[in-house]
Amino acid sequence: MDGTNGSTQTHFILLGFSDRPHLERILFVVILIAYLLTLVGNTTIILVSRLDPHLHTPMYFFLAHLSFLDLSFTTSSIPQLLYNLNGCDKTISYMGCAIQLFLFLGLGGVECLLLAVMAYDRCVAICKPLHYMVIMNPRLCRGLVSVTWGCGVANSLAMSPVTLRLPRCGHHEVDHFLREMPALIRMACVSTVAIEGTVFVLAVGVVLSPLVFILLSYSYIVRAVLQIRSASGRQKAFGTCGSHLTVVSLFYGNIIYMYMQPGASSSQDQGMFLMLFYNIVTPLLNPLIYTLRNREVKGALGRLLLGKRELGKE
């Protein structure tokens, strides 16, 4: 357990809020409710997108994948978090930590790239409306999703092993409640300059590059919308992008605030609460944003519910 290399460890201890049991009990209830709502909301989006023929379009194809990502992302960490919050056992096995880190890096990378793909989809829909279904054909949509998953997995395969193999000189206490990569790097008893440089390069490719692409896509969208003469037409065009833009702002705003500010300017508690927001609140809000702001999704939900009622009457 106290070997000099991370690969010989059998477990890690997630300290989290273990020094404040009263806070753990409150967090357990709040996180459990949020997790259940996340499961219901994202599962509903997936089912509605697949069952309603009116939603068999590229936009909802990508939205279903985003909901699946959110489901996978929360399920990869929240059950373990709830287990640790509910009892005295704060440990996580080395293998469990490795799996969680791999999923965290992989799914996070996929979501960054998928949001960029969704921005491109909205750009084509507004800038090339007459050619939209030709350009965004099923083959291209499947190809784009496959590329995002491939890049996310490659990013995780590149970063997870080197992070887990860092020598920790017997240290196995993680000052966090999740297997966050920066927390694992801080445990190392050797220089981490090389791995931090690698992390920065990969972050530019997987996180910042999609953000730049999203901003460029929306610059084309804004220019195209401003050329629409009618106010109702402009409002409708902006409305089709509103939900996606809100999700992008929520996702990237949280990442930038967590990782781009100086370490001395934020406390450990603040960092942990931000990570909670990133892992729980964002996946919870995504289906609400798309449902509340989207008439097509609300209409599809209504049709499915009415259909079930009619079948029940028969």
Swiss-Prot record:
One of its GO terms (molecular function) is G protein-coupled receptor activity. Keywords: Cell membrane, G-protein coupled receptor, Glycoprotein, Membrane, Olfaction, Receptor, Sensory transduction, Transducer, Transmembrane, Transmembrane helix. Its main location: membrane. Residues 1-25, 80-100, 159-195, 260-272 are extracellular. It comes from the Eukaryota. The chain crosses the membrane at residues 26-49, 58-79, 101-120, 140-158, 196-219, 237-259, 273-292. SUPFAM superfamilies: Family A G protein-coupled receptor-like. It is a multi-pass membrane protein. Pfam families: 7tm_4. PANTHER family: OLFACTORY RECEPTOR. This is Olfactory receptor 2W3. The lineage of its organism: Eukaryota, Metazoa, Chordata, Craniata, Vertebrata.
